Each structure stands twice: as C-alpha cells, then as structure tokens.
C-alpha cells in the first residue's frame, strides 16, 4: 500500500499510521509532510524500524528550503517517480 502524507505529522493520527504500515508498504511525504524527513525528526525516528520505504517529493523539499536537512534514509523522488509509485501500489491511503 502507498501511504501519502501531505501534512506535518502532528496534524494527523501518526500512531494510527504506524499501526497500519505493513511490510512492503511505502510512505510518500509531500507538501508539509516532507518535514517528517528532516534528520532527527521524532516521527522519522519512529519510522526507522518499520519494514517500509520512505519517499519524499523533491520539489516540496526544495520549495521549503530543506534540501540539506533531509535524512539519507529517505528516498527523494520527483513527480515522474510519484506517478510510478501510484502505478506500483494499487491500494493507497491518504493521511
């Protein structure tokens, strides 16, 4: 399943998001959600043990001036990659 997070983590039920993550899922951070990808962010730390891949939309990272602060554990993607993720994951959950 592809989970998309367009909001800062404190604006959503993040514990519920963590509970619903399954092995092989992906989490795409976009819009204000890219703040989760900042190195040392407590929400990112809680994702480290999850059996998922965390992606962040590069355009949203750049728009917020966060390029140098993003954790190396987060995969940066562009809009083309975003489309590929939506094709790869038939099921999606928007938070």
Swiss-Prot record:
The keyword tRNA processing applies. Keywords: Cytoplasm, tRNA processing. Gene3D superfamilies: DsrEFH-like. GO terms for biological process: tRNA wobble position uridine thiolation. One of its GO terms (cellular component) is sulfurtransferase complex. It is found in: Cytoplasm. Its main location: cytoplasm. Pfam families: DsrH (PF04077). Part of a sulfur-relay system required for 2-thiolation of 5-methylaminomethyl-2-thiouridine (mnm(5)s(2)U) at tRNA wobble positions. Belongs to the DsrH/TusB family. Heterohexamer, formed by a dimer of trimers. The hexameric TusBCD complex contains 2 copies each of TusB, TusC and TusD. The TusBCD complex interacts with TusE. This is Protein TusB.
